[in-house]
Amino acid sequence: MWKSILAIAIGAAAGALLRWFLGLRLNSLFPSLPPGTLAANLVGGYIIGVAVALFADMPMLSPLWRLLIITGFCGGLTTFSTFSAEVVDLLRQGQLQPAFAAIAVHVSGSLLMTMAGIASWQWLRR
């Protein structure tokens, strides 16, 4: 149990630090669609795609790796709550077009990046 908790905590801390760094570096570039949050969600979608495919192909890997990468790192990196708050803020400001653009880009982009991650792993294992 303690190993699982430690794996999740280490992964979550690393993911959250990367999310903070992306926001710090990117959000001022285009505030109406904060690119740091978008980058975190797209990168996280890609990483989780690779991880899901990798763990499916390598069931002999310790479950601690899955907890570290998927539950911890991707959970700490991706940020649905921040995305939701940013969209609601845009809606409250009457910025409907940027709000709906953010929804479309985050959701479709994350799904596409997850599929790209799975495809990347399948390509790499050949």
From Swiss-Prot:
Activity regulation as described: Na(+) is not transported, but it plays an essential structural role and its presence is essential for fluoride channel function.
Major localization class: membrane
Keywords: Cell inner membrane, Cell membrane, Ion channel, Ion transport, Membrane, Metal-binding, Sodium, Transmembrane, Transmembrane helix, Transport
GO BP term, example: cellular detoxification of fluoride
Topology of this chain in the membrane: Multi-pass membrane protein
MF term (GO), any: fluoride channel activity
Catalytic activity: fluoride(in) = fluoride(out)
Pfam families: CRCB (PF02537)
InterPro entries documented for this protein: FluC
Subcellular location: Cell inner membrane
Organism domain of life: Bacteria
Any Gene Ontology CC annotation: plasma membrane
Sequence intervals crossing the membrane: 4-24, 36-56, 68-88, 99-119
Binding-site list for Na(+): 75, 78
The keyword NAD appears for this protein: no
Function, in words: Fluoride-specific ion channel. Important for reducing fluoride concentration in the cell, thus reducing its toxicity.
Protein family per UniProt: Belongs to the fluoride channel Fluc/FEX (TC 1.A.43) family.
Name the UniProt record assigns to this protein: Fluoride-specific ion channel FluC
Species of provenance: Chromobacterium violaceum (strain ATCC 12472 / DSM 30191 / JCM 1249 / CCUG 213 / NBRC 12614 / NCIMB 9131 / NCTC 9757 / MK)
Name of the encoding gene: fluC
